[in-house]
């Protein structure tokens, strides 16, 4: 799992900086949330899935228990060459099935408005935006959004 965690940290920092010009404050935030996930990880309530292509990591998605009925979707990321090829939907389907299997009633996630393709995947899977917050400390004009999904059995 250590190499998976290193991949998640490295690629989130690299891609968000290159594609969204997010600051070092965001990089520190990534370190904090990933290490918190690792420290609290329980395979009965949490999961981390790494997409591989030709033996190399090519994307990630995770589920973390927020409370007994709520999960947080985290670390959803695809390498640029893997985007818009259906892999994001596959990762999302796997993560949401894990939530159903574990009996979660709701899933939430945090994203930024600039993540247009990811936001489309969220909408396609039934998530809806519930609120937004200025995160200018991460970069100019960065707005973080909270999206939620009620899980229907």
Which residues does each predicted region cover?
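C-terminal "cap" of GNAT-fold acetyltransferases
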Residues: 1, 105-153
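Acetyl-CoA-dependent GNAT
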Residues: 1-81, 89-94, 98, 102, ...
């Amino acid at each position: 799992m250590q190499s998976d965690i290193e991949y998640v940290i490295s690629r989130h920092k690299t891609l968000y900086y290159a594609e969204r010009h997010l600051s070092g404050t965001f990089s520190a935030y990534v370190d904090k949330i990933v290490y918190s996930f690792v420290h609290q990880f329980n395979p009965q309530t949490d999961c981390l899935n790494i997409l591989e292509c030709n033996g190399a990591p090519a994307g990630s998605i995770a589920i973390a228990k927020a409370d007994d009925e709520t999960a947080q979707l985290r670390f959803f990321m695809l390498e640029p060459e893997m985007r818009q090829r259906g892999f994001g939907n596959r990762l999302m389907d796997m993560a949401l099935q894990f939530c159903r299997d574990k009996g979660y009633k709701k899933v939430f996630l945090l994203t930024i408005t600039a993540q247009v393709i990811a936001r489309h995947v969220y909408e396609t899977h039934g998530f809806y935006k519930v609120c937004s917050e200025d995160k200018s400390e991460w970069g100019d004009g960065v707005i973080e959004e909270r999206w939620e999904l009620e899980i229907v059995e």
